[in-house]
């Protein structure tokens, strides 16, 4: 059985000498793992996490791990390795994909979203883009937040809370009596022009973290790369 697709390498682990298992997030087939062999400097460069590749997967049966062959399309290593904010953001997003997506489950629209994010990240780290990535990931896994209007009154102004139950924004008037039980909605998620304060960064990360923990991080398990990103971001404002 053969699978041919374009993909992003999101994980690589050693199997034996010069042999590795890579996990690739493919455009049309979701996550696929395959065995690759490294016998040259060129092949080592090809099989780096974050590389966009032409991916060929071969196995006798669909349920096997299979062998993989890759041709490099684009490498992001040089853009990320010298900038901690970019590197930690990159490590976080690929670790979240590996953690939350199931093997061989198609996410073709999200694949395009990821490629666009990596292109933007290679140019400049933007915290707003990172949070929008996490929100898009929540939506892709079935837990979309509606931050466009109040979930009760339907007004589109004075939105400052998010209901942890409905995942919808709430206006100041509606949410005020219950504010101690609500999540805060950072202003920068409602306007592309607003500057982002440290407190708003905390609010944004608390917002996505709540829904990750409630629905996706089983047994309160955290993604280490995401924790590293959060610590760096909040301590280097």
UniProtKB/Swiss-Prot annotation:
Q: Sorted alphabetically, which Gene3D superfamilies does this protein's record hold?
A: Nucleic acid-binding proteins (2.40.50.140), Recombination protein O, C-terminal domain (1.20.1440.120)
Q: Sorted alphabetically, which InterPro entries does this protein's record hold? A: ARFGAP/RecO, DNA_rep/recomb_RecO_N, NA-bd_OB-fold, RecO, RecO_C
Q: Is-annotated flag, keyword DNA repair? A: yes
Question: What are the GO cellular component annotations?
Answer: bacterial nucleoid
The question of whether Disulfide bond is a record keyword is answered with no
Keywords, A to Z, come to: DNA damage, DNA recombination, DNA repair
Q: What is this protein called?
A: DNA repair protein RecO
Q: What is the lineage of its organism?
A: Bacteria, Pseudomonadati, Pseudomonadota, Alphaproteobacteria, Rickettsiales
């Amino acid at each position: 059985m053969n699978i041919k697709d374009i993909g992003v390498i999101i994980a690589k682990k050693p199997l034996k000498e010069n042999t590795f298992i890579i996990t690739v997030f493919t455009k049309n087939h979701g996550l696929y793992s395959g065995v690759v062999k490294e016998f040259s400097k060129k092949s080592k460069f090809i099989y780096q996490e974050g590389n966009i590749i032409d991916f060929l997967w071969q196995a006798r049966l669909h349920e096997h791990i299979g062998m993989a062959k890759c041709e490099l399309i684009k490498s992001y290593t040089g853009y990320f390795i010298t900038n901690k904010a970019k590197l930690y953001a990159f490590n976080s997003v690929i670790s979240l994909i590996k953690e939350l997506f199931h093997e061989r489950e198609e996410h073709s629209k999200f694949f395009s979203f990821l490629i666009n994010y990596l292109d933007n990240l290679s140019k400049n780290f933007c915290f707003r883009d990172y949070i929008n990535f996490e929100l898009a990931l929540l939506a892709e896994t079935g837990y979309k937040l509606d931050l466009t209007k109040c979930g009760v009154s339907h007004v589109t102004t004075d939105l400052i809370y998010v209901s942890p139950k409905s995942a919808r924004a709430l206006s100041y008037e509606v949410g005020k009596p219950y504010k101690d039980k609500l999540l805060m909605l950072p202003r920068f998620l409602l306007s592309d022009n607003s500057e982002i304060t440290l407190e708003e960064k905390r609010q944004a990360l608390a917002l996505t973290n709540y829904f990750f923990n409630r629905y996706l991080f089983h047994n309160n398990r955290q993604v280490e790369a995401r924790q590293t990103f959060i610590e760096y971001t909040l301590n280097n404002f």
